[in-house]
Amino acid sequence: MFRKSSRIPTFLKNKHNGYPTTASEIVEPQESWIAVWPSELAIVSNTGDWRVHEWFEIEAASWDSALRELTITFVDPAIEILRVRFAADANEQLLTMVHERVERSIVCRNYVDLPSGSMAYGQIRRRADESLFVQILVSAQPTQADVKEIAKLESELRDMVGLDF
């Protein structure tokens, strides 16, 4: 049931990446584990259901020590915020790795206030295969005037890292 060396259950072995670098049993969602690899994070239930996210999909992760809760927000607003509650013995290595991996996936970022009054937020992100891509998020539906500023933001971000169109 468990790997001897680190007490990671065998059901956490990923067919693509092998055993996670670190993992921890969690209180909520019930009967689940959070596991992290250099390329991704997964919430895995004891029944074998997997919810996997590559690091570039994650906008931010924050730790509330009073609640013992890790809150993960995603770039895609359609993906519900993930709240992971730990028992009293939270895995500090796992928390550090989540933070470091999310930060590593963000190469650079910039913001621009748009003519419509909304804001565009852009960043160059890194996939697990080390390829780079642009993410642009806009706080409201862009107007025609906004589109020019958004294109300028994307161009500036690409120039920062030498990324072609």
Descriptions of predicted regions:
Residues 1-165:
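Eukaryotic intrinsically disordered, low-complexity regulatory linkers and tails enriched in Ser/Thr/Pro
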